[in-house]
Structures are given as structure tokens and as C-alpha cells.
């Protein structure tokens, strides 16, 4: 038996064994499979899997794996039923079947499947360990800087997170929809990544690295300016009992202990959907429409749930630009557009940290000032990003896209 075939058999057995072990493990079920966040992360595997390998046999095997895990966990092991666990069962089954398919594929098909499978696996792993990073940050920074962010938001003349919170409270259906988009973040990431992988593979590596790096890099910034969110700061007072603008102007800002893991600043959800939108360029209209919908509802959800302040979303623009510039691997480090994007991304993010910590009195002079800074941050970030994208779309890449489009029509 050839060594290559032996290795494939070993990898297949390992994948099957790991899938069954994780699917039937009580602790993993409780900590991960029953979690909505992990469920959507695993569901994103199905999207990449079936877009790269759209075979009925694979879909049937995913369904069979889902029913098998559900039957054993609930009928035999008597785990506590959870709706999201069914989505996790399907995603876990896809992860195993996708991996086996990548192992046994050949040539260009194998390369395509590996480029899809490895990021899908890493996305799930990063989601699973995200809580550990946040707990580590919370342990190192027991006091959060929420009062600084709340004071800035109030200097705008309107407390946007409280307004959106009241809208969510008045219209529960909108809150449910917003939460689904918020928790379902892995879905557009998988959709856009697999779409670019099918369109032109050279663009997928920067996207993959940026999506994966957002979490760890974001946690580094959380350690520089940790915050929890207005819902945690005000507790039962959110969203119907905010301070008045006059009261907010007089509060003494200082670090304070707030229960919960840090969630800012910046808003990583906002950074992710910005990257999804930016990397969706060149894809079909329906793919870009889904990316836009996730961006729109994520903005509503981050504010309406009270998990973020408005300024969190503003700082996400230069932060996302920073990540895109770091991952623009097709450009030289000295490329002007890449350097400009990197410098503004880093300076914009850290500059906001400095202003929020030391210059709140400046923003309270007139609401025109904080609004002007917010608009300027967004506009300059978008201009730098557009120039960066223009430079990364080289003639060689465009030629490859045109060549693949032509071959698909013949």
C-alpha cells in the first residue's frame, strides 16, 4: 500500500474519530455545541463546503451526520436539548465530510478544497477560544473605561445607543432580526471568502488573514482601552433611563469595575462586517447584497443591544483599514497606498484612544466638534481604503478574472 494512501486513510480515520468524539462529548456539547455563536461558526463551514463541493452526496451525508449525533446525544446520552445544537451537529458533520473530501481529492480540486477547509477550521477554532482571550483581558483589566465612551456619546447631543435600545425594546421583532444578524457574523465571512475563492484565489489569502487576525489584534486594542457596553454600565436602566445630556456633562469620568468581559474598543463586529463589505467587491449582486444586509443590521444590533457605544463603531473604521493594509500581501510594504492606509489606520485608532482618555472637555464645547471628528474619521478611512483596493487589484488579477469568466462561458 503506497505511503500516500496510508496517510490519507490515517487522516480520514482521525477526522471521523475527532468528529464523533466532539459530537458525543458532554462538556464540549455544553460549552460549544449548544452555544449560538459556535453554532453559526460551524454552520459557516457548510457554506464553504457546499459552495466548493456542491454534491448531493455531501448534503445527504451532512444530514445523516446531523441525525446521528442528535439521536445519540438526546436518545442515548440524554443531553439537554438545544435548538442551536442541531445547527452545530450539521456544521460538525460538514467539517468532517469536507475534510475527508479534501484529503481524497486530487490536483487542482484538492488545492481548492484545502484553501477552503483550512480557513473554515481556523474560523471555528478562533470562535471557540475567543472567550478565553476576553477572560484574559478582563482579568488583566478589572476596571473598564465605559464612562469615557458614554461621555463622548453624550457630547454628540443624542445618546444613540439608548435610542436604538428603545427602538429594539418597542419592536421586539427588530431586536430578534438584529440579534440573528449579529450572532450570524460567520455566515457572510464564509460566503464572501468562498465567493472570492471561486472567483480568483489570489485575493482570498489577504481576506482569510484579515478575517482571522481581527479577533486577536482586536483583543490587543481591548487591553489598551477596555470597555463593556452601555447595557452593562446601566444595567436595568438601559435603554429607558439614560442620564440627561446635562447630567452626562457633569459626570466624573474614571475607570470603574463593571461585570462582564470587555467588548470594545473598537467594535470587532463592526470591523468584521466592514471587511466583509470591502472584500465583497467583484462578487455577484446577491453576494454583495447579503454582505450589505449584514453590515446594516450589525450596526443596528451593536447599538440596540447595548453592547456598544456609538464611538466604538466609528473607531472600527480606521481599525478595519489597519487590518486590510496589514494583509495587503500583493503590495510591497513600501507601497504608498499601503503605507498611507496603515498609518492612518493605526494613528486613527490610537488617536481616538488618546482623545477619549484626555480630551473629553474639548468635545463638550459644541456637538459640532464630535460629529465633525466622527464624519472625518469615516470619510478618510473610506478614501484610504478605496485607494488601497484600487492598488491591490492589479492588471494580472483582472486578467485572471476575465480569463476564468471567459472559460466558464465556453
Residue ranges and their predicted role:
Residues 2-12, 49-66, 111-117, 204-211, ...:
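Membrane-interfacial loop-to-transmembrane alpha-helix junctions, especially the N-terminal start
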Residues 18-28, 69-81, 103-105, 351-364:
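Juxtamembrane "helix-exit" motif on the non-cytosolic side of transmembrane helices
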Residues 55-92, 116-189, 392-410:
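N-terminal transmembrane-helix/juxtamembrane module of multi-pass inner/ER membrane proteins
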Residues 113-121, 190-225, 233-234, 290-295:
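Interfacial segments of alpha-helical transmembrane regions
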Residues 174-188, 259-279, 310, 314:
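Membrane-interface loop-to-helix entry segments
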Residues 192-196, 270-288, 318-330:
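Membrane-interfacial alpha-helical segments at the cytosolic side of multi-pass membrane proteins
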Residues 219-288:
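Membrane-interfacial catalytic/cofactor-binding modules of polytopic membrane enzymes
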Residues 342-406:
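Transmembrane helical bundles and short interhelical boundary loops of multi-pass, membrane-embedded
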Amino acid at each position: 500500500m503506497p505511503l500516500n494512501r496510508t496517510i490519507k486513510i490515517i487522516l480520514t480515520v482521525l477526522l471521523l474519530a475527532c468528529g464523533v468524539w466532539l459530537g458525543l462529548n458532554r462538556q464540549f456539547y455544553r460549552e460549544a455545541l449548544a452555544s449560538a455563536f459556535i453554532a453559526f461558526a460551524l454552520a459557516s463551514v457548510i457554506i464553504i463546503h457546499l459552495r466548493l463541493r456542491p454534491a448531493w452526496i455531501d448534503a445527504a451525508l451532512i444530514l445523516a451526520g446531523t441525525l446521528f449525533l442528535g439521536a445519540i446525544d438526546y436518545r442515548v446520552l440524554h443531553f439537554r436539548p438545544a435548538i442551536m445544537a442541531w445547527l452545530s451537529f450539521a456544521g460538525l458533520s460538514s467539517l468532517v465530510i469536507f475534510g475527508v473530501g479534501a484529503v481524497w481529492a486530487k490536483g487542482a480540486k484538492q488545492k481548492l478544497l484545502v484553501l477552503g477547509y483550512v480557513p473554515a477550521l481556523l474560523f471555528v477554532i478562533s470562535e471557540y477560544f475567543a472567550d478565553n482571550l476576553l477572560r484574559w483581558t478582563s482579568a488583566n483589566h478589572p476596571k473598564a473605561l465605559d464612562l469615557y465612551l458614554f461621555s463622548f456619546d453624550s457630547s454628540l447631543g443624542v445618546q444613540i445607543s439608548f435610542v436604538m435600545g428603545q427602538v429594539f425594546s418597542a419592536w421586539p421583532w427588530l431586536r430578534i432580526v438584529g440579534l440573528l444578524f449579529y450572532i450570524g457574523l460567520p455566515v457572510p465571512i464564509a460566503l464572501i471568502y468562498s465567493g472570492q475563492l471561486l472567483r480568483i484565489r489570489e485575493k482570498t489569502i489577504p481576506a482569510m488573514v484579515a478575517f482571522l487576525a481581527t479577533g486577536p489584534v482586536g483583543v490587543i486594542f481591548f487591553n489598551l482601552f477596555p470597555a463593556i457596553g452601555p447595557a452593562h454600565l446601566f444595567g436595568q436602566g438601559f435603554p429607558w433611563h439614560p442620564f440627561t445630556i446635562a447630567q452626562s456633562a457633569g459626570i466624573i469620568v474614571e475607570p470603574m469595575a463593571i461585570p462582564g468581559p470587555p467588548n470594545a474598543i473598537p467594535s470587532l463586529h463592526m470591523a468584521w462586517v466592514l471587511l466583509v463589505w470591502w472584500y465583497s467587491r467583484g462578487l455577484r449582486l446577491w453576494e454583495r447584497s447579503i454582505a450589505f444586509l449584514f453590515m446594516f443590521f450589525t450596526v443596528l444590533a451593536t447599538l440596540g443591544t447595548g453592547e456598544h457605544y456609538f464611538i466604538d463603531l466609528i473607531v472600527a473604521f480606521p481599525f478595519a483599514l489597519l487590518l486590510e493594509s496589514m494583509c495587503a500581501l500583493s503590495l510591497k510594504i513600501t507601497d504608498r497606498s499601503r503605507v498611507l492606509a496603515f498609518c492612518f489606520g493605526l494613528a486613527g485608532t490610537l488617536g481616538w484612544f488618546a482623545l477619549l482618555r484626555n480630551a473629553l472637555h474639548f468635545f463638550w464645547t459644541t456637538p459640532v466638534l464630535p460629529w465633525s471628528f466622527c464624519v472625518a474619521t469615516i470619510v478618510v478611512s473610506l478614501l484610504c481604503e478605496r485607494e488601497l483596493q484600487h492598488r491591490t487589484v492589479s492588471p494580472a488579477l483582472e486578467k485572471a478574472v476575465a480569463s476564468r469568466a471567459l472559460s466558464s462561458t465556453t
